[in-house]
């Protein structure tokens, strides 16, 4: 499939996803903004090297009606987008879209790395402030053996309170993005420990529903209990599907049958086709009067995405 055809397919898929998602919210909810993650491009469409067709992605985001996107690959990808920050500002302004946040992380469970992570957080916060974003999505480090998770999480939480203070100096809030593929904060008990051990005034919650699903969490229960900690989240429907066959991606990469990454990607479903109570989540948001971004972080676009929406 040629790149132009693939981009058209992705655009059709994203537009339909946005329409389905917006249908779950009342038209009178101006406090919610919708974004998409650039991870869809960086993970499955673009090669690992060379200058990226970045403005093509921006066009798709504009044409499909999103308000903005989550910037992924920071800071290394800045050298590959084919423009400086001033030009990026112009390209965003021309399309009337925003950078909603960026993905951030580091070995927060290693005290010897804290100064380095803090420096990176200051740079990330400066970047976000320049683009008038107000949230930083933090990913946890790689997970150790389960026996050691509690201690590593304790160390990380001590740092995350400090990280919240650092970001606040720039008018930025930060919070945890749970991840089900080998990171420190995956399961329900780990999420709840993190939210218990961090200061709610300093460190918040940026969950991802597909990762909550893959970790077998009580998604509705978590949203009910911690809705007041939400500052940003990824809304993705999901249904488990083991990858039985080789999966060839648009960027030429191949996921061998039985891979965890391929199985995870196949588990991403169009809204209403999975097993997550999306309406229940939206009711909770309404009850707490949630204000902020909802990210449609569809991690995988199938070869013919249009067929599932017609």
What kind of feature is each model-predicted range?
Residues 57, 88, 124, 163, ...:
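Aromatic/hydrophobic pocket-lining residues that form π-stacking "cages" and hydrophobic walls in ligand
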Residues 10-17, 28, 91-94, 98, ...:
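Active-site acidic/histidine proton-transfer and metal-coordination neighborhood
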Residues 39-41, 72-76, 104-107, 141-143, ...:
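Active-site beta-loop-alpha junctions enriched in small/polar residues
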Residues 70-89, 143:
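Glycine-rich, proline-tolerant flexible connector loops at the mouths of alpha/beta enzymes
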Residues 39-52, 107-117, 149-151:
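Active-site mouth loops of central-metabolism enzymes
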Residues 2-65, 187-310:
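Histidine-acidic metal/acid-base catalytic patches
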Residues 70, 101, 137, 175, ...:
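Conserved beta-strand positions in the central sheet of alpha/beta enzyme cores
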Residues 53, 84, 116, 120, ...:
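Soluble or luminal CAZymes and related metallo-dependent hydrolases
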């Amino acid at each position: 499939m040629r790149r132009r055809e693939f981009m058209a397919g992705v655009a059709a898929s994203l537009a339909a996803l946005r329409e389905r998602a917006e249908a779950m919210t009342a038209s009178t909810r101006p406090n919610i903004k919708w974004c998409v993650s650039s991870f869809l491009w960086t993970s499955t469409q673009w090669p690992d090297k060379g200058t990226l067709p970045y403005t093509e992605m921006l066009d798709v985001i504009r044409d499909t009606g999103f308000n903005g996107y989550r910037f992924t690959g920071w800071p290394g990808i800045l050298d590959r987008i084919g423009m400086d920050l001033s030009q990026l500002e112009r390209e965003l302004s021309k399309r009337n879209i925003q950078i909603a946040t960026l993905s951030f992380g580091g070995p927060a469970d290693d005290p010897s790395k804290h100064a380095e992570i803090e420096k990176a957080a200051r740079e990330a916060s400066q970047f976000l402030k320049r683009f008038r974003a107000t949230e930083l999505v933090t990913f946890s480090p790689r997970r150790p053996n389960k026996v050691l998770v509690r201690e590593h999480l304790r160390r990380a939480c001590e740092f995350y309170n400090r990280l919240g203070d650092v970001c606040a100096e720039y008018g930025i809030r930060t919070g945890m993005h749970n991840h089900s593929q080998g990171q420190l904060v995956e399961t329900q008990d780990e999420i709840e420990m993190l939210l218990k051990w961090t200061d709610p005034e300093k460190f918040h919650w940026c969950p991802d529903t597909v990762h909550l699903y893959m970790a077998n969490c009580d998604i509705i229960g978590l949203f009910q209990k911690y809705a007041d900690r939400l500052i940003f989240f990824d809304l993705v429907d999901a249904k488990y599907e083991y990858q039985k066959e080789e999966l060839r991606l648009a960027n030429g990469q191949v996921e061998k049958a039985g891979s965890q990454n391929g199985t995870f990607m196949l588990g991403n479903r169009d809204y209403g086709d999975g097993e997550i109570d999306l309406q229940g989540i939206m009711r909770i948001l309404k009850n707490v009067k949630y204000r902020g971004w909802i990210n449609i972080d569809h991690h995988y676009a199938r070869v013919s995405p249009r067929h599932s929406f017609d």
